[in-house]
Each structure stands twice: as C-alpha cells, then as structure tokens.
C-alpha cells in the first residue's frame, strides 16, 4: 500500500512539472509569432530599426536566389526595398526549449534594394533562439520561391 501511494505521488509531481512546460511552450509560440509580425511590420513600413533588435549578430540568411546574407546585408536590403504589399500566410511556430522554428509563406509586391520589381510568392523558415539575456533573436532564415 505504501508503494502505491509513493507511485501516485511521483505521478502527481510529474504532472505538476509537465503542465507548466506546456503552458510555457504555448507562450513561446505566441511570443515568436508576435516577433514575426514585428518583422513583417518592419518590412511593410520600410523601417529596419524595428527588426534590427530581432536579428542575431551571427545571423545567416539564404535567399530564394541561393545567396547567403549576414545581418548587415539583411538590414541594408530591408532599408532599400519598397513594398507595395506583403502579407504572411500559413504561419506556424513550433518551440523546442530555447529554440523555435517559424514557417510560413509571403506574397510580396514592390521593388527590391536594386530597384528591380518584385511580384513573388515565397515560403520561409526562420530559426529563433532565446539568448542568454532572455530575448528571442532570429539566427537563421531560409526563403524558397513558390512557383505559380
């Protein structure tokens, strides 16, 4: 009988640690989704200062053209691009402890930093890490062209 009570106690204590973890995961996913929306606002308003704090110093991005960019290149491109419209679709965030993966698609119309017109549909994946200071930053991003 004593062993049964011990076993029940272990199970109940285990549930107590699982429930907060699930709540934290849901909060993490909402927090990272909000950061993705902040990134979108930055692009729509042509204001790279909104996204700069969200991009890690060692950021690595891969564009739909296969070019690899760093943080400085990403922010320079954001400053020079002009968007007539940009909307996110099918955004999903999955948390894995201090890492979160955000995926989605974007329809983009406007001009890029070189003045070339854009009218594209892309799928993207962003990798976010919760840094030592407790803030989330995007460490990697990959964009693929969706063919019509």
Question: Which residues are covered by each model-predicted region?
Answer:
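Bacterial N-terminal signal peptides that target proteins for export
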Residues: 1-9
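A detector of low-complexity, intrinsically disordered, Ser/Thr/Gly/Pro/Ala-rich segments
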Residues: 4, 15, 23-26
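Bacterial N-terminal signal peptides
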Residues: 8-20
């Amino acid at each position: 009988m004593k062993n049964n009570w011990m076993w029940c106690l272990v199970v109940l204590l285990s549930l107590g640690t699982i429930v907060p973890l699930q709540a934290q995961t849901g909060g993490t996913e909402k927090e990272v989704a909000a950061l993705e929306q902040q990134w979108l606002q930055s692009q729509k308003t042509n204001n790279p200062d909104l996204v700069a704090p969200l991009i890690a110093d060692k950021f690595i991005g891969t564009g739909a053209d296969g070019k690899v960019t760093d943080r400085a290149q990403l922010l320079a491109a954001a400053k020079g691009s002009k968007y007539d419209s940009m909307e996110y679709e099918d955004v999903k965030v999955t948390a894995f402890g201090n890492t979160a993966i955000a995926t989605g698609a974007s329809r983009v119309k406007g001009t890029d930093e070189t003045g070339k017109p854009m009218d594209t549909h892309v799928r993207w994946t962003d990798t976010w890490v919760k840094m030592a200071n407790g803030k989330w930053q995007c460490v990697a991003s990959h964009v693929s062209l969706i063919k019509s």
